[in-house]
Structures are given as structure tokens and as C-alpha cells.
Amino acid sequence: PSGPGGVAIPRAGLKKYVLPPDYSGIVFPERTKLKFMDKVPAVPKVRREPRQLRDIRGPSREATDFTQGQYGILALGGGYLHWGHFEMIRLTIGRNMDPKTMFAIWRVPAPYKPVTRKSLGHRMGGGKGPIDHYVTAVKSGRLVVEVGGRCEFGEVKPFLTQVARKLPFPAIPISRDGLQQMRQEEEEKRLNNQNPWTFERVVTANMLGMRKYLSPYDLHLKGRYWGKFFLKHRV
């Protein structure tokens, strides 16, 4: 406001600045960028395997928690990663991250599972076809890659979102705190559920004889997973 004669009166204001985050406990690995993954496993002779779709069925039991990084990409469904997906992840993150202040590590192994395919126009029969390529099986709830360092989630979220959209299964960028909050919300939803007719109760009581239509996986996973798909609306 102006004083007498239109002269501005100087006033001292009190400003409160937000304290910067503390990065003192972060340990950087020797190599800050993602390492190159081999297209073919280094084994003398690979045996041709059945499909074994159980590799991508249900929840993951490994790589479900953060180890070094603060941010990462979380799979919300099952699927197979080809070597091209590994290169896409490595190149996209490598171009966008600052290796002096950030680091990234893999949470999935290199392609190890052989996938066979017969040549185009080949007739039926004649045994199993030759190995065409190798893939890595990923289950729902597994971390694909971790990113950490002296950075905030807003800095890494754009390129992590770009990577997550190109993966062959539903995935989201997430932080360490966000993962913990997501699990707390799922637990609260389960404890505060007002609907008495849950999937677990209906199946346990064998209502309308539905057991004969369900598999042992449905009983074990309580209907939250349908093959490789994660049904997040189920309680």
C-alpha cells in the first residue's frame, strides 16, 4: 500500500522455505546406468520347454519390495518381456536420467525362457519347432526396474510413465512411499468391507455347488487373480 504522497512504505515479510529432502543415506552402485542384457542365455545347449503359463500366473513372490532405489516401475499384471523391451527400458531411462545424480538397477533377470516357433508356411506335425527367441516371465506385483539418487519423484515420473506404457502388461511408476500406501489402502479396504458376500466366503461355503467350476488356483488366490490378470476391484 502507498503512504502519504503515493510513496510506497517498505515492509519486511516473513518467508518460510520448505527444507530440501535429505539424501545422506543413499548409496550409489558402481555403475549408475542399466547394464546391457544378453539376447540369448550363455548356456551350451538349451532344452525346448512347454509353455508353462503358470510362470505369469498369480502374484509375484520375489522383487516385490525396494532394495536400493526410491522409485520404480510396478507390474500390475503378468506377461513376458522380450529382449526388445529390455533395450527400450535401458535406452529410454539412460537418455533421460542424469548419471551423476541418479542411478538405475534391474529387478528382473535377462531373457532365459525359450519360445519355439515354426517357420511360416510349415505344415503341421514334425515335432516341436526350433527356438525362436527368449523371454523373461514377470508376475503381477513385481518391480521391473528401480531408480534412485538425489532426485524427487516428479523428476523421474515422466520417463518412467513413458516406459510403463510400452510394456506388454499393465504397469505404473511408483515410489517407495506410494507402494507402502497402496498396500495399506488394500488392507483397509479388506478390513472395512461392508459386503458380507465376499468371494472367499461364497467359495468356502460351496454355494450352488460352484466348486466344480473353479480351479485350485481360484481357491488359493481367493479370486483376486484370473490367470495373468490382477482383479484389483476384488476384496
Question: Where do the protein language model's features map onto the residues?
Answer:
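Ribosome-associated RNA-binding proteins
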Residues: 1-235
